[in-house]
Amino acid sequence: MFRLQQGLKTRQTRFALALKVALLGGVVAFSSVAHAEVILKEGITPASDASQIPASAKLRTDTVVAGISEPQGIFNPYFFINGWDENVTNVIFSRLIDWDSQGKLVPGLAESWTVSPDNKVYTIKLRPGLTFSDGSPLTAEDVAFTLTVLLDPSYDGDTDITLANIAGGADYKAGKADSVSGLKVIDPLTLQVTTTQPGATTLAKIGGPVLSKAWYGKGYQRGNLDYLRSLHG
């Protein structure tokens, strides 16, 4: 499973929130964290028979194990089909652009970004030194690949970036183009995204979790994402 080796505060926060939800059996959604805090203060029921806890689990110093009720095991941020799997993916995948506690867009995997005067061209600079859990570097190619998958004709997940109006996205989705013309890799750490019109939510839509092209793109062919649906995590 791929995780980005980056100690961002936002990811640590997501982990804490996800753990709280997981400890509650997935009953509480992230939007109900305040309610989760109340329940946690009331106490957590300990294991009925602590002797059944494996010795290896007792000795862990760097791993937290939390149970969830009904996971489907699809730990992919763009293909999960229930909230339990979403809770897990929110912990192990970091966003390109995130939100702070006031709902303001803030850097995530992206170090910074600029927007053209006409609000149609977004130049995103990645943080240097980021790697996936296998040690491979996070690059602009990975971001471009992720956005391309979301514009694939066969993509039917919950993430809809068509409203970002990326240039060439509609043609790629319709099978009229071999690539998305609005996605341009400037250098390993810089991606330029050109849109056909300004949009207030464009940055949020293109700033989601990033998939490793080397891992998730091994069998990619436009119009066939079946392999990605079965490649969990």
Protein language model annotation of sequence segments:
Residues 18-30:
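Bacterial N-terminal signal peptides
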Residues 30-36:
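Sec/Tat signal peptide C-region and signal peptidase I cleavage site
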Residues 39-63:
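N-terminal low-complexity, Pro/Thr/Ser-rich intrinsically disordered segments
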Residues 59-63, 91, 108-110, 117-121, ...:
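Extracytoplasmic
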Residues 111-159, 192:
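Aromatic- and charge-enriched surface segment that lines or borders ligand/interaction sites
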Residues 197-233:
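Gly/Pro-rich hinge or "lid" segments in bacterial periplasmic/extracellular proteins
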